[in-house]
Amino acid sequence: MKKILIILCILILSCNVFSCEFKNGREYTEKHKVISNIPSIIEFFSFFCPYCYEFEKTYDTQYLIEKKIKKNINIQKYHVSFLGGKLGYVLTKSWIIAQQMGIEKKIVLPIFKGIQETYTINNLDDIKKIFKEKAGVSESKFNSFWNSLTIKILISKQEEDIRKYNLKNIPTMLINEKYVIDYSKIEEIFKDSFAEKYTKLIQFLINKKEKI
């Protein structure tokens, strides 16, 4: 009986510490009134965002989420078009095509590098070249995806979601359509053990219940 009480006390204390570790307005922000019933994560980024590039190279957030959080979660990654002018839209559409092909990991860093380091990506043909060199995608296959109705529907939905969430900063993560994580804030707060605290924060928000 004594052992059971000790275990219960430890669990209660650990839960309290965990819940107090993260605060609304500090590590995350409550964005919307209604929480989604389906656990979901949406990452927002741009190939024109230097901070997004550094974050992708250093932490590989997709890997952290998939490997560290043991739960069936709908994970999406949206490229925003409000940076980069016309090329921003072209990159958004190309990113959706890469997702549909399942080749995101092969092209994400080469595109970042081409945009921000070598300055070798300036138009759609340059993007097609990356797809071919890094993922073996022929121009005809790329074009068939580019002109497909599916891609048009997906890009319309994504742009509608971005407008709905009214995001101001990137990179940003939206959890359960309610909680927003601004990477620029948490990197400094979590600097000593970022990956561990970052995944704990995501888990905390995924499991967070609305107060009735």
Swiss-Prot record:
Domain of life: Bacteria
Signal peptide: 1-19
Keywords: Disulfide bond, Redox-active center, Signal
Family matches, as Gene3D superfamilies: Glutaredoxin (3.40.30.10)
InterPro entries documented for this protein: DSBA-like_thioredoxin_dom, DsbA/DsbL, Thiol_disulfide_DsbA, Thioredoxin-like_sf, Thioredoxin_CS
GO molecular function: oxidoreductase activity
Disulfide bond recorded as keyword: yes
Pfam family, one: DSBA
SUPFAM superfamilies: Thioredoxin-like
Disulfide links within the chain: C49-C52
Family: Belongs to the thioredoxin family. DsbA subfamily.
Role this protein plays: Involved in disulfide-bond formation. Acts by transferring its disulfide bond to other proteins.
Protein name, UniProt field: Thiol:disulfide interchange protein DsbA
Organism: Buchnera aphidicola subsp. Acyrthosiphon pisum (strain APS)
